[in-house]
Amino acid sequence: MPSPAGRLHRIRYIRLKKSSPDCRATITSGSADGQRRSPRLTNLLVVAAWVAAAVIANLLLTFTQAEPHDTSPALLPQDAKTAAATSRIAQAFPGTGSNAIAYLVVEGGSTLEPQDQPYYDAAVGALRADTRHVGSVLDWWSDPVTAPLGTSPDGRSATAMVWLRGEAGTTQAAESLDAVRSVLRQLPPSEGLRASIVVPAITNDMPMQITAWQSATIVTVAAVIAVLLLLRARLSVRAAAIVLLTADLSLAVAWPLAAVVRGHDWGTDSVFSWTLAAVLTIGTITAATMLAARLGSDAGHSAAPTYRDSLPAFALPGACVAIFTGPLLLARTPALHGVGTAGLGVFVALAASLTVLPALIALAGASRQLPAPTTGAGWTGRLSLPVSSASALGTAAVLAICMLPIIGMRWGVAENPTRQGGAQVLPGNALPDVVVIKSARDLRDPAALIAINQVSHRLVEVPGVRKVESAAWPAGVPWTDASLSSAAGRLADQLGQQAGSFVPAVTAIKSMKSIIEQMSGAVDQLDSTVNVTLAGARQAQQYLDPMLAAARNLKNKTTELSEYLETIHTWIVGFTNCPDDVLCTAMRKVIEPYDIVVTGMNELSTGADRISAISTQTMSALSSAPRMVAQMRSALAQVRSFVPKLETTIQDAMPQIAQASAMLKNLSADFADTGEGGFHLSRKDLADPSYRHVRESMFSSDGTATRLFLYSDGQLDLAAAARAQQLEIAAGKAMKYGSLVDSQVTVGGAAQIAAAVRDALIHDAVLLAVILLTVVALASMWRGAVHGAAVGVGVLASYLAALGVSIALWQHLLDRELNALVPLVSFAVLASCGVPYLVAGIKAGRIADEATGARSKGAVSGRGAVAPLAALGGVFGAGLVLVSGGSFSVLSQIGTVVVLGLGVLITVQRAWLPTTPGRR
């Protein structure tokens, strides 16, 4: 049973009119028609299987997968460490787990006044209400404590920090940004005020984003160039159609495969990956077709090559590209991982080159026009002309000079914030560092704030850090009012006020002397008066006693007489109808006056008793008066002796108090704005309403976590990666004792992003180096160690030279540093197109040598056969430059390196490889 392209072993290429440059070759078969049917059916089944696989795969993708969401940025890796840090920050402070930061900026024509705050508050409130697109808002300007951090130097702008939904550099973040800007546009206008959103470049920058029509344009141009290369190599239009059909089937199968591998996490580089996959697929299949044509041309009049003989030609381009792109699925940088995703398309193209491409060629039939050799030495033949060693050395020297700018290369992660509008109103780098400290205890007490102050001091000492916003430094700098030196200044003011009140006190003390003398005279007069009164009272008491005795005697006699008359009184009371009885009436007239006398005597006696009691009390009071007057005289004497001492003491204390007040005031002035005044915030100040906003925004809801924002100088580049470890070390040093012992430190923001990018780039650089060494080892196995080393050095030298020229162009001429992902992505694309160009040339030359013993002068050269990969790589790079519109984008930078690198690669191939001896 023949192979999927079993008919190929019976096809013979017959040269027609060998001397004519326009000759064509036709297919003839050495077998009978009956022997032809089974292989033809097999080839049809192969083609049908590919078509069915493409249709089924796309249908399954359509009905089983939801619409893909762009949740992965092109540069920021999402490793476990980053995810854990983001999760801890979001858990402590809900809504702030995103690294998509924006700033609300309210600008006025003049200095903002309190009457402008309602418009600012309305903008903040509107953003907080849009919970679908806004995670959290940190208000600065409305709080007097934090207002200095959110106010521009000229006082015309007020700022608030906004966390958007979605990760930086993703479509979700871009949609959130558009939404919040729309919210601000819907605010009622305020005269003289304008609200806008300022974002760091990393928030909304999607450097690898290509639109669908741009991708289609690049792929279409690549397909046209591939067809032109096929026609220039004297291949038929039918052969070009077979190449395009094979590429279409490969892409139709590769697209669902890539979707399955990547799932819903497409990322901003998905279209970029598909474009690269399409270009590499077209280039791979075109190169395989041209290599197969070269093999047939080299066969000459000998037996036609079998499928086994053609297998290296069909497999070599795809295998070389797949070896370099497939392992990039292990890359951590999303953009470079996207190149690995494009490698999936190359794997499918390799499979198509081994199956459906030979089948379509076989199905072309005997009447189809197939590859024929070119005559003469065309441009592909000239690529293989030997050159001198002097030329190789000269090329090496030029390459070394081109590499020199790499020495001063700067790695950028985002655009320089100083070039962004509104950057002058921000406290520092538009993307701050975030340090979250998680403790097992409540940190909302004076001791914990002292520890937070120590951490803030440590962090601001880290190189590049300008300001640190924390619960202890709410304005980004040491809080002067929350210090012992500031308290000393307030105490000095109080002492100064009290010292001024001592002068009237001394005057009053001096006047007390005369007052005491007057009081002493009055006491003497009182003493004399009391003595006279006491003597008079005693004399009156002597006259009162006989009167009281006589009154009591009269009362007694009256009582005794009443007892005698009681019988008569009782008879009168009990007599019936006394008024009509003469005797009873007469007795009653006698008794009634006497009763009146008895009643009067009783009242007289009672009054006498009261006079006696009052007299007794008066005598008792008057008797104690001399003693009380004596006590008053003694107290006055003590006061008289104390007043001079008090006057002397106050006069002596006044200079000391003034001196202490001056010393405390000078102490406060000397430590003002130094941050070394001894931080202290009392519990009363912690509970004060003026600190409420800081307490709520800088501590977690349970108080066990606090966050610090660090604003640094300069731009976000890979140099900031070192700051992440410095921040952890600095915070750890301040937490060896005190309230933050054994607390957990989490670093996020700019430093964490730079560190994650740096680690991912290092990992991916090592991965690319391993891949390159693997390719070199395989090339050495095919053609010898010298040729293998030449391939590796050639690709590396071409890349470094192109990178150096690009650095000179972008960094030194245009003042734009290369984005951090440009070197690796451009190297991956360059190597994917360049390594097959070099390796396939060596291998194709060996195949030709083994087939004929010598290369046919009229055949397409081995390097010329794989020229489509290099040419289409150049088309891809130039397309990236064009679709970026000539801007300073990452696509332009990648395209520049790729185009220059491929140009240098061709030069290196001409200068080095022909002079390199090979192993036979």
Curated annotation (Swiss-Prot):
UniProt protein name: Phthiocerol dimycocerosate exporter MmpL7
Organism lineage string: Bacteria, Bacillati, Actinomycetota, Actinomycetes, Mycobacteriales
GO cellular component annotations of the record: plasma membrane
Keywords on record: Cell inner membrane, Cell membrane, Cell wall biogenesis/degradation, Lipid transport, Membrane, Phosphoprotein, Transmembrane, Transmembrane helix, Transport, Virulence
GO biological process terms held by the UniProt record: cell wall organization; lipid biosynthetic process; lipid transport; xenobiotic transmembrane transport
Origin species: Mycobacterium tuberculosis (strain ATCC 25618 / H37Rv)
Subunit structure of this chain's protein: Interacts with PpsE.
Organism superkingdom: Bacteria
Protein family (similarity comment): Belongs to the resistance-nodulation-cell division (RND) (TC 2.A.6) family. MmpL subfamily.
